[in-house]
């Protein structure tokens, strides 16, 4: 009996052990006793005379046949016939009640039916059947043989077939040689050798008929490519067998094919294996560590290596450095500023130019001039002006249109508002601008005044000056650049190369001439305010901050600079109650050409340099008079120093007094 059949292994679930029944071992025990006993008697009592009388090859031949028969008998008995492991308990909880009884598959174009096995809980493969004796589904089940006490299936059918063939031949040999011995000893039948030979011949003759019949039957089945179960049940009796390959191929497949795999594992004892944790080095001695030299030739001891390893595995990596969101303080030197002009400064972050949400007005009007420009109810500074620190605050990009640029150039045109050019820009056109600190305005005004003084000293014509830094565009231009492309460094610093520069050119036009009687108001007003472009680098912006304007003194030469033509009439200022917060801004004063967005840059320049004729004479433009007055108001008494021209980014030329 195959012991391994009742116990499962590692490849599948173990089959339930069969109950012990002594009746199962009677046939196999009888077959083994007759086979071994009869052959032993034949070899002991009959073969010696055959070897003496005929040849010694006869006993040797019978021994070989007997051993071959016994080997096939043992293989057919103890080998796994091809038992399928049973399904898990949780796999058939739902399928057991709903699964159909049969399922059809196609094999070589022929429909083959598979039956549901309720015991093993799966559909049996083709040519598979459930053995009622072994209580297992066997692949290519042939039959259950009681003489070998095992099922004959795919894995052991070859040995069973060879056992039948060899047993038939062995029975024929034993019976024939025994008959030969009796024929030569007819007068000595009373001897022991003759009696034993007659008994062996009877047993061989008794088993020859069924064994020979069974062998012939299986020869026919092998030639046809069928199994005993298929032949008995008549599955392919009236049709075509899809598993046959011809007579010779079928015989070759049974005798010479490779061994089929085993589906049930063998029962093995558990083995204890020591497995070291991963990523751990084996312990090393001090001698081994001393002999180990690193790549740089430095030897380290075991303790130092353990410390380094513990630090590398336990210590957390350092966090990444936090980005610096503000420009650090840099040394304010002229050499650094000039050297930085030759290099491309880094692209500034966009979050520095977002509008400040703390501005009180809708358009982020400066809090210093909110009460004076919008409401008109006070001519003094608001007490709510925040105290600015040393670090500049970059909130937004103002638009230097109309009078705002003139306030940066002249510094004395904001007479109506009382705070320089910014007040004039708010009075004309009613435009409001983003807020920025007074420190930046003063630094920009000082830079502009220095450039005007140096230009007047060198006897140069005072043309329209462009604000320090690059030419800034309006928020509309920046929005167009953001919508049409990225705010790269080139597009921010050189807007004249972009197509949006033309749309913003009218905001950069020089201002109209201002009446000279407003100069007196500007002389006693707040310090001249200016504008520093936020697109400049940190070094350029810090360099402009250190150039603080000198105290402004009235120039004694103001009497020589009188306008030839009479100034136009000035519109009366609005009373504090004349206009509310929601009312539209006042229109331009009579006699002044309104500065709208239709005026281009060239038109503004033409108005400045176009000579005006009064009584056939040529008079100086008001813009020139205005700039001369601004120049004499600032630094007319100080001796002129050297002027250094520096070309900045965006095509802007700077005149720096050294």
Curated annotation (Swiss-Prot):
Q: Name one GO cellular component term.
A: plasma membrane
State which Enzyme Commission number(s) the record gives. Answer: 2.3.1.225
Please state what class of enzyme this protein is.
transferase
Region ranges (Disordered): 306-419, 490-522, 540-658
What keywords appear on the UniProt entry? Acyltransferase, Cell membrane, Lipoprotein, Membrane, Methylation, Palmitate, Phosphoprotein, Transferase, Transmembrane, Transmembrane helix
A Pfam family assignment: DHHC
Q: Which reaction does it catalyse?
A: L-cysteinyl-[protein] + hexadecanoyl-CoA = S-hexadecanoyl-L-cysteinyl-[protein] + CoA
Question: Has keyword Membrane?
Answer: yes
* Bias (Pro residues) ranges: 565-575
Subcellular location(s) per record = Cell membrane
Q: Would I find Nucleotide-binding among this entry's keywords?
A: no
Q: Where is the composition biased (Gly residues)?
A: 407-419
Basic residues compositional bias: what residue ranges?
Answer: 634-644
Q: What are the positions of the active site?
A: 145 (s-palmitoyl cysteine intermediate)
Q: What's the stated role of this polypeptide?
A: Palmitoyltransferase that catalyzes the addition of palmitate onto various protein substrates and is involved in a variety of cellular processes.
- Spell out the protein name for this chain: Palmitoyltransferase ZDHHC5-B
Q: What species was this sequence derived from?
A: Danio rerio
């Amino acid at each position: 009996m195959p012991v391994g059949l009742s116990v499962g292994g590692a490849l599948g679930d173990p089959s339930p052990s069969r109950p012990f029944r002594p009746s199962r071992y009677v046939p196999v025990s009888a077959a083994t006793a007759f086979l071994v006993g009869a052959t032993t008697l034949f070899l002991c009592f009959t073969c010696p005379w055959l070897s003496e009388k005929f040849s010694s090859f006869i006993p040797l031949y019978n021994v070989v046949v007997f051993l071959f028969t016994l080997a096939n008998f043992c293989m057919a008995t103890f080998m796994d016939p091809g038992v399928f492991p049973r399904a898990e308990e949780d796999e058939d909880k739902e399928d057991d009640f709903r699964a159909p009884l049969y399922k059809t598959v196609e094999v070589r174009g022929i429909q083959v039916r598979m039956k549901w096995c309720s015991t093993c809980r799966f559909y049996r493969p083709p040519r598979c059947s459930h053995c009622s004796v072994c209580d297992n589904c066997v692949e290519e089940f042939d039959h259950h043989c009681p003489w070998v006490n095992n099922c004959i299936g795919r894995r052991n059918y070859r040995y069973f077939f060879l056992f039948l063939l060899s047993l038939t031949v062995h029975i024929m040999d034993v019976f024939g040689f025994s008959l030969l011995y009796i024929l030569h000893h007819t007068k000595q039948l009373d001897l022991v050798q003759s009696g034993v030979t007659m008994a062996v011949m009877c047993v061989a003759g008794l088993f020859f008929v069924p064994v020979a019949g069974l062998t012939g039957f299986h020869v026919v089945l092998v030639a046809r490519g069928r199994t005993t179960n298929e032949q008995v049940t008549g599955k392919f009796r009236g049709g075509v067998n899809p598993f046959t390959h011809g007579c010779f191929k079928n015989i070759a497949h049974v005798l010479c094919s490779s061994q089929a795999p085993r589906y049930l594992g063998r029962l093995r004892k558990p083995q204890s294996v020591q497995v070291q944790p991963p990523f751990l080095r084996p312990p090393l001695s001090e001698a081994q560590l001393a002999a180990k030299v690193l790549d740089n030739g430095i030897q380290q001891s075991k303790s130092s290596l353990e410390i380094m390893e513990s630090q590398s595995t336990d210590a957390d990596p350092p966090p990444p450095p936090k980005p610096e969101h503000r420009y650090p303080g840099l040394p304010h030197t002229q050499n650094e500023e000039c050297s930085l002009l030759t290099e491309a400064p880094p692209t500034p972050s966009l979050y520095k130019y977002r509008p400040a949400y703390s501005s009180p007005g809708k358009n982020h009007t400066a809090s210093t001039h909110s009460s004076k420009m919008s409401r008109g109810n006070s001519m003094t500074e608001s007490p709510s002006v925040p105290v600015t620190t040393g670090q500049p605050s970059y909130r937004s990009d103002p638009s230097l249109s109309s009078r705002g640029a003139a306030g940066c150039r002249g510094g004395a045109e904001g007479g109506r508002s009382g705070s320089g050019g910014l007040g004039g820009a708010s009075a004309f056109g009613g435009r409001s601008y983003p807020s920025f600190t007074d420190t930046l305005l003063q630094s920009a005004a000082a830079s502009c005044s220095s450039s005007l003084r140096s230009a007047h000293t060198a006897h140069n014509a005072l043309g329209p000056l462009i604000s320090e830094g690059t030419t800034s565009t309006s928020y509309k231009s920046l929005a167009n650049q953001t919508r049409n492309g990225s705010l790269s460094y080139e597009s921010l610093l050189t807007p004249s190369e972009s197509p949006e520069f033309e749309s913003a050119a009218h905001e950069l036009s020089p201002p109209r001439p201002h009446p000279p009687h407003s100069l007196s108001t500007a002389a006693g007003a707040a310090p001249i305010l200016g504008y520093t472009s936020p697109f400049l680098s940190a070094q350029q912006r810090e360099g402009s901050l250190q150039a603080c304007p000198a105290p402004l003194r009235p120039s004694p030469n103001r009497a020589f600079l009188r306008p030839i033509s009479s100034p136009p009439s000035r519109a009366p200022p609005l009373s504090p109650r004349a206009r509310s917060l929601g009312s539209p801004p006042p229109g331009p004063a009579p006699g002044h050409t309104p500065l709208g967005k239709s005026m281009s840059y060239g038109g503004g320049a033409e108005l400045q340099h176009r000579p005006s004729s009064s009584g056939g004479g040529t008079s100086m433009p008001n813009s020139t008079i205005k700039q001369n007055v601004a120049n004499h108001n600032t630094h007319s008494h100080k001796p002129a120093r050297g002027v250094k021209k520096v070309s900045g980014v965006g095509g802007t030329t700077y005149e720096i007094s050294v």
